[in-house]
Amino acid sequence: MYKRPGHKHLSISIIMDTNTPSVLTVLASWGWNCASSSPATQCLERSTQGCLREGPSAQGCDYCEPVNVENGPPTTFVKNQDHAKNQEYTHFDTLFMVSSIDELGRRQLTDTIRRDLRHSLAKFTIACTKTSSFSSSYATRKGRKKKGPRTQPSNKSLQMFILCRRAHAKHIRAQLQAVIQARKPRKYYTRAIDGSTHPVVPVFVYEFAAIDTVSLHRDNVIVDSSGS
């Protein structure tokens, strides 16, 4: 999560009881026939020491093999071989989600991020979705006719997703942080439960890594324009 300098946030530490039995252990004690997944089915996280997965899925594991920076993961790694052989498809393995809650002017914020990424990351091939907005069930039920101060938060939120290749993830991550921290605080507001507004909008950035490559048609991709 990125916030404006000086904005205080709470840090919570959780102490885990290491003596607590696992769920599978408890179920087995109740007579359930449970079997845990073998460690050999798990992939080393972003490692180059080799893959622990067995069988066909271990061949050319995207986490353990070097990535072609220009073209992304080799097409032999793509699960859908029809897409792998089709040059009209671009392959991604990393996803960023930009999220914010109860923000006024949220469309403008994500439009700004999208426009900045298009220009500042022109040498990389990425895919960027439009902004999606979601509301809680409470906000849907209360109706639009009721006016006045709100008694509960609406939990209205936005999400925007950016797909890229793992080799480019550090550049996407750094640029997202830069454009979010460069926001003008008076331009974006968040609404409190009592209806008042504040010029500080927390923006959350989550990063996900895919085990299987995601393929998108090039019509939906912002392609590398460094050569133009």
From Swiss-Prot:
Please classify the protein's predominant subcellular localization into one broad category. host cell
Post-translational changes noted in the entry:
Phosphorylated.
InterPro entries, per database record: Herpes_UL3 (IPR005035)
Quote the subcellular location field of this record: Host nucleus
Does Amino-acid biosynthesis show up as a keyword for this record? Answer: no
In terms of domain of life, where is this protein from?
Viruses
Q: Please report a single Pfam family linked to this protein.
A: Herpes_UL3
What keywords are assigned to this protein?
Host nucleus, Phosphoprotein
For whether the record's keyword set contains Phosphoprotein, the answer is yes
Cellular component aspect of the GO annotation? host cell nucleus
Q: Which family does it belong to?
A: Belongs to the alphaherpesvirinae HHV-1 UL3 family.
Name the chain's protein: Nuclear phosphoprotein UL3 homolog
Source organism of this protein record: Gallid herpesvirus 2 (strain Chicken/Md5/ATCC VR-987) (GaHV-2)
